[in-house]
Amino acid sequence: METLFNGTLALAGRDQETTGFAWWAGNARLINLSGKLLGAHVAHAGLIVFWAGAMNLFEVAHFVPEKPMYEQGLILLPHLATLGWGVGPGGEVIDTFPYFVSGVLHLISSAVLGFGGIYHALLGPETLEESFPFFGYVWKDRNKMTTILGIHLILLGIGAFLLVLKALYFGGVYDTWAPGGGDVRKITNLTLSPSVIFGYLLKSPFGGEGWIVSVDDLEDIIGGHVWLGSICILGGIWHILTKPFAWARRALVWSGEAYLSYSLGALSVFGFIACCFVWFNNTAYPSEFYGPTGPEASQAQAFTFLVRDQRLGANVGSAQGPTGLGKYLMRSPTGEVIFGGETMRFWDLRAPWLEPLRGPNGLDLSRLKKDIQPWQERRSAEYMTHAPLGSLNSVGGVATEINAVNYVSPRSWLATSHFVLGFFLFVGHLWHAGRARAAAAGFEKGIDRDFEPVLSMTPLN
């Protein structure tokens, strides 16, 4: 028995019996038409780049320099600012022209890609194998597939090195840890030690460790891009020059749908990692542009009230809270001094406005009494009222914070969207992997419904 609604439907001379695909799987037409598939990919790239350029110009047109970026619903300008364009000390925007240039360059690029996509989809050769053998391929050709993989890896490596070049030679990048509250600087002293760079990969993902998401200085981030770019380029050269070994030929499925499933799996992993990075990391995603992280807003609230009550005469070192623990300060299980109250669970936050007040054993009481600077108070009060919480129609911020501002943080947008997209890509990976494996094993029509277990079970009622 087939699971079709209408197996006899024929569209454009195709039907399900002869092609193995239903009418709604339109992309299946392109599986063996490398020229048309190229057109679809180039046109898709054009749409992506058009969105980037148009959205970029939209954000520039709506941007108000007097308000922080994270209060304005911006998701592209913070990325440009993080790369050091248009900003000065403290993350203040001093020039929006670079943002305008970025938008226009992307729009022009999208026109070129759009023309190429339409050309290859409608006018160019249906298949590339005959006229352009270098660009042609057959999905089963394992050697050609690993060559294409190698070319992609080299392009990714070049992309990683573009960030390195920007940080080292072309004006530098924004460093939220620069003294006095952040600034654009060139990265001079790269971290290239493999024990440091790969040490991040070996860390636990949990509190106080945080795997690669715990990276908190730009030297490590840019050094990591040197390593990653080098590995991608060397791996790319390797895959271009070699043929797959016997174990790889046996272990992997070599079909277009299998490659689709591998790609979806990889993108899913990227999405989940990006979600954690933008939610927790305030070095790669500086709080000046993206707003504070959740832990940062919570710790900022504790710090703000510590400052207030200390001015009013409270002894913040010994005041007891309603639970019998310290009201403002307490000790973590391992002995360091941390903020007390509900924010104790965020004890492992590191932020540029707070670190100067730490000593060798956590927060330093004498520094808290004598060394708090006005910029630290201002920044923590600002972050306290801008927690990345709240849904689209709610007042953003901590529910108990009466001064919270009505906004939705770009951290919420970016973390949520990447989690959801990562999840859907993962489901797509499972779906296409299952289909590809079934096709390779020769039973792509699904399980035989005549002998399904449910048929021999008693009715539920």
UniProtKB/Swiss-Prot annotation:
The chain crosses the membrane at residues 57-81, 122-143, 166-188, 243-263, 279-300, 435-459. Residues 1-2 form a propeptide. Its main location: plastid. [CaMn4O5] cluster binds at E355. InterPro entries: PS_antenna-like, PS_II_antenna-like_sf, PSII_PsbC, PSII_PsbC_sf. It is found in: Plastid, Chloroplast thylakoid membrane. The modification Phosphothreonine is found at T3. Keywords: Acetylation, Chlorophyll, Chloroplast, Chromophore, Manganese, Membrane, Metal-binding, Phosphoprotein, Photosynthesis, Photosystem II, Plastid, Thylakoid, Transmembrane, Transmembrane helix. Binds multiple chlorophylls and provides some of the ligands for the Ca-4Mn-5O cluster of the oxygen-evolving complex. It may also provide a ligand for a Cl- that is required for oxygen evolution. PSII binds additional chlorophylls, carotenoids and specific lipids. One of its GO terms (molecular function) is metal ion binding. One of the components of the core complex of photosystem II (PSII). It binds chlorophyll and helps catalyze the primary light-induced photochemical processes of PSII. PSII is a light-driven water:plastoquinone oxidoreductase, using light energy to abstract electrons from H(2)O, generating O(2) and a proton gradient subsequently used for ATP formation. PSII is composed of 1 copy each of membrane proteins PsbA, PsbB, PsbC, PsbD, PsbE, PsbF, PsbH, PsbI, PsbJ, PsbK, PsbL, PsbM, PsbT, PsbX, PsbY, PsbZ, Psb30/Ycf12, at least 3 peripheral proteins of the oxygen-evolving complex and a large number of cofactors. It forms dimeric complexes. This is Photosystem II CP43 reaction center protein. It comes from Platanus occidentalis (Sycamore). The gene is psbC.
